Amino acid sequence: MAGMRIIVISDIHSNLEALEAVISSMGSFDAIFCLGDLVGYGADPNEVVDKIRMLEPQVVIAGNHDYAVVSGDTSGFSSHAALAVEWTRRTLHPRNMSYLAGLPHCSLREEQGLRLGMYHGSPREPLDEYVFPGTPEFILRSMVEYAGVDILMLGHTHMPMQVDMGSRYVLNPGSVGQPRDGDPRASYLILDLDDGHVRFELRRINYDIDSAAEKILSKPVPKFLADRLYLGY
């Protein structure tokens, strides 16, 4: 059985410059898994959704911002996040709104003899639960068992996480478009599967933050959304 290389991305948040830099760095791969939040915060929602559609990922699931843009429900969102959602709703083309509306909230599949589970938040709350780095291992194990998988892939926190629990793994690729771990570079994960064997590598990629931030400043959204790109938080 030939091995499989999967590119895992998440939390692009309408940041076209970051997404393009990540795509340029990917090299060869067999599949792309996108763990949600294509839109929100950033200045290029249509361009990002178009780019993802063009890539034809094997897995694309909805994040909480994607759901909020489709539904209009921003309950629980901060004021700056809600303003970005409202602007995105006014800006998004109908074809891209329909694409987001059709995204599932999770994906389960088997590859290379391993069961994979993809959620934006968690198996218990696919859109909204945060599973941060440092979460106790017994909690992570309970999530893996709840999902019935060998490898659990999550997004939402914008913080990379790779936890190896022997034959079970919890992975978060971090955020392409708005990292929050103190490193402003775009973040994604390379996952290599080969007949039950697992290897993974986190990659950080420089991108044109100035351009992404300037475009945000030209939109009717809070200035903070541009500033935080430089902070990585």
Language-model region placement:
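Core catalytic region of metal-dependent phosphoesterases/phosphodiesterases
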Residues: 2-101
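Short acidic-hydrophobic surface loop/beta-edge motif
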Residues: 105-113, 163-165
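Active-site environment of divalent metal-dependent phosphoester hydrolases
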Residues: 13-18, 40-43, 65-70, 124, ...
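Active-site-proximal beta-strand elements of phosphoester/diester hydrolases
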Residues: 5-13, 115-122, 170-174
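Active-site-proximal segments of metal-dependent phosphoesterases and phosphodiesterases across multiple
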Residues: 2, 75-83, 113-147, 179
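A short acidic, helix-capping loop that chelates divalent metal ions and anchors anionic groups
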Residues: 68-72, 125-128, 211-213
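Acidic, His/Gly-rich catalytic cores of divalent-metal-dependent hydrolytic chemistry
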Residues: 151, 163-233
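Anionic-ligand binding region
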Residues: 130-173
